[in-house]
Regions:
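Conserved, mostly hydrophobic/aromatic
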Residues: 23, 32-33, 91, 152, ...
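Alpha-helix-loop-beta-strand connector modules within alpha/beta enzyme cores
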Residues: 46-77, 115-135, 170-193, 227-232
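Structural motif
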Residues: 25-27, 70, 94, 124, ...
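Catalytic cores of alpha/beta
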Residues: 16-23, 85-93, 136-148, 193-209
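Hydrophobic, well-structured mid-protein blocks that either form specific transmembrane helices
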Residues: 86-140
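Hydrophobic faces of well-ordered beta-strands that scaffold small-molecule active sites
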Residues: 2-8, 30-32, 73-79, 99-101, ...
């Protein structure tokens, strides 16, 4: 069955908490989109409220509290930030299940591969590492990294960091290419997902669908999830 993951873009901590609450007890994993206003134009928590100095962010880093509803939900951090590698240790303190790096933001790919393969074994066992790729980046660029990560996230929209964008059909060819070359690779698609697009993505072999507006603005989230999970 396809895995459905809600994507949360948050103006501030309370906004994030309220959006996560919508799927609490319904879905086990939520993707938190962290946007720094540098790698992408949009800015989300904690960068929109002071960055590392944000009081809630500080409380989590100091282990005074956890992420909202951390006892019920696992988190996938989508690092749409310029400092993903240099501040990796900080992001791990949010206790994510998965972390997604963006290939366009990590710099030299050989150095990044060395970084991934050099992550402490304890951390690597606890956190799945994914690499995201934009529709405008040649899919071949990701090939050298595939065997060093746990999954690939294909962005389904050209302007990342924003929700409600139109799906970019180029991602379908990227998925096809990846599945042909790496049949066992877990592929996630983030952005532009609606029911019609979801059907195409599942037929193309996608394992995970990451959706923001489709889920969080749905009149009935449970029904929306049920429809997506039963697409074949």
């Amino acid at each position: 069955m396809i895995e459905i993951i809600p994507a949360v873009l948050s103006r501030n901590y309370e906004d994030m908490k309220n959006k996560i609450a919508l799927v609490r007890g319904i879905l086990p994993v939520v993707q938190i989109d962290l946007c720094d206003g540098i790698f992408v134009q949009n800015t989300t928590w904690p960068f929109s409220t002071g960055g590392v100095s944000d009081i809630n962010f500080q409380r989590i880093l100091n282990e005074q509290e956890g992420m909202p509803f951390w006892e019920d939900i696992d988190f996938e951090l989508d690092l749409m930030v310029a400092d993903a590698v240099s501040n990796f240790d900080i992001y791990t303190k949010l206790a994510p299940k998965r972390i997604v790096f963006h290939i366009e933001a990590v710099g030299d790919l050989n150095e990044f591969k060395d970084f991934i393969e050099g992550i402490d074994v304890y951390i690597r066992d606890a956190i799945q590492i994914g690499i995201a790729i934009n529709t405008t980046t040649p899919i071949e660029k990701i090939f050298p990294l595939v065997n060093s990560v746990d999954f690939v996230q294909c962005m389904g929209i050209e302007k990342i960091g924003f929700q409600g964008q139109i799906f970019d059909e180029r991602v379908l060819n990227n998925i096809k290419t990846l599945k042909e070359k790496y049949p066992d690779l877990i592929i996630s698609v983030d952005g532009g997902v609606n029911f019609e697009i979801a059907q195409k993505l599942i037929e193309a072999g996608v394992d995970r669908l990451v959706a923001g507006s489709l889920l969080l603005k749905a009149e009935d989230i449970r029904e929306t999830i049920s429809v997506l999970e039963n697409l074949v």
